[in-house]
C-alpha cells in the first residue's frame, strides 16, 4: 500500500519513540515486577523443582554438593552411595585418611583435591559443630571447600532457608535479562 507523507512520518516517529523506550532504563519497580513474573512462571512450569543430588541428611547433601563442582549430579550420585555406606557421618569421614577416600570418588574430576576437602570439612564439622552441619550461611562458608553456592544449596534443600544459588549459568542469565551487571554472585 502507498503511504502518504504524513503517515510515513508518523510511522517513523513511532519507531523512534519505541527505540527510545527500549533504550530507556527500566525503573526498579518495573524490574521487580518482571522478576516476580518470571519467578511465577517458572514456579508454575516447574512446581517440583528439587536438587538432583541424592541425600538422606544435611551431611550427605553437603558432601555431595562439594563433590559436584565441575561435574554432573548424575556422576556424583554414582559414587555417593558407596562413599556414605563406608563413611556415614562426619566423624567417620573425619577419621579417614585422604588416600582411603580417593578410590570412592576417583571417577570424579579433581578427586584428590575433593577427597582432601571433604576429609578436612568433616574434621571441621566434628571440631567446631559437634559433627553437625551448621544452618547459617556464615558458618557454612567457613568450612573447607564451601562457598556461597554450596552453602545456599545446603540451606535451601536441607534447612528450607530461602536463598539464591548462583552458578555460572544462572549468573549469565541474570545479566542477559538485565537483573545485574555484576560478574561475581556476591
Enumerate the language-model features and the residues they cover:
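Catalytic cores of DNA base-excision repair glycosylases
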Residues: 23-186
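Polybasic, lysine-enriched low-complexity intrinsically disordered terminal tails
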Residues: 1-27
